[in-house]
């Protein structure tokens, strides 16, 4: 374990993860001394660790991100097992994004949204403005060609955005954030997957009781049985966890 400013780092499978105690700790860390940190936020769960193990390009993308945090309960439990004194809790990416947007609205921080279907993105913008008065300085749905990427990066740079959130799924969103940072480096980037869909009610999230019990994965599996193949991959992660191969 090493210290990273006001938050410790815990290594799993060679990747250093930030150990936030709770959401308040996460926000205070990202807005330390009234200055929003710059870099890339990546949510880490068991599935992402497995993918990083098998795909060198994904591992390089994740390793390059400054702020890797424990999004999955299995990752939190592994940290606690490997580091018994760790005071770390799960900070779900969807919850962190909402908290970040609420804080951005309060601070007047300019935000640029990328990804999602056009109608979902429009609803996300409207709800963010209504709910937290978020200063959205630009947006782009997820339907653009590779040839349009540089124009998008130029728009983001011209907007002066300090927070850029990208909902395209992994590893597409990590690739886009990496490339955009070459044009617009002075911002906090966050990959958010399907968060816009959840935020606007198009996708139902597990009830709070399931989340609090660490069973959100089971709720998703019961709601979407086709996920069983993906979930079977996690048996490998369980072996890592219980044999201490972390």
UniProtKB/Swiss-Prot annotation:
Q: To which pathway does this protein belong?
A: Bacterial outer membrane biogenesis; enterobacterial common antigen biosynthesis
* One of the protein's GO biological processes: enterobacterial common antigen biosynthetic process
Enzyme class, UniProt record, top EC level: transferase
User: Which Pfam family, giving just one, matches this sequence?
Assistant: Glyco_tran_WecG
- Which cysteine residues pair off into disulfide bonds? none
Identify the keywords attached in UniProt to this record, alphabetized.
Glycosyltransferase, Transferase
Annotated GO MF terms: lipopolysaccharide N-acetylmannosaminouronosyltransferase activity
What EC number(s) does its UniProt record assign?
A: 2.4.1.180
Presence of the UniProt keyword Glycosyltransferase in the record: yes
Instruction: Give the catalysed reaction(s), semicolon-separated.
Output: UDP-N-acetyl-alpha-D-mannosaminouronate + N-acetyl-alpha-D-glucosaminyl-di-trans,octa-cis-undecaprenyl diphosphate = beta-D-ManNAcA-(1->4)-alpha-D-GlcNAc-di-trans,octa-cis-undecaprenyl diphosphate + UDP + H(+)
Q: Which domain of life is it from?
A: Bacteria
Q: Does the keyword Cytoplasm apply?
A: no
NCBIfam families reported for this sequence: PRK03692.1 (NF002980), wecG_tagA_cpsF (TIGR00696)
The UniProt function text for this chain reads:
Catalyzes the synthesis of Und-PP-GlcNAc-ManNAcA (Lipid II), the second lipid-linked intermediate involved in enterobacterial common antigen (ECA) synthesis.
- Similarity remark: Belongs to the glycosyltransferase 26 family.
Protein name, please? UDP-N-acetyl-D-mannosaminuronic acid transferase
Source organism of the structure:
Salmonella heidelberg (strain SL476)
Question: Lineage of the source organism?
Answer: Bacteria, Pseudomonadati, Pseudomonadota, Gammaproteobacteria, Enterobacterales
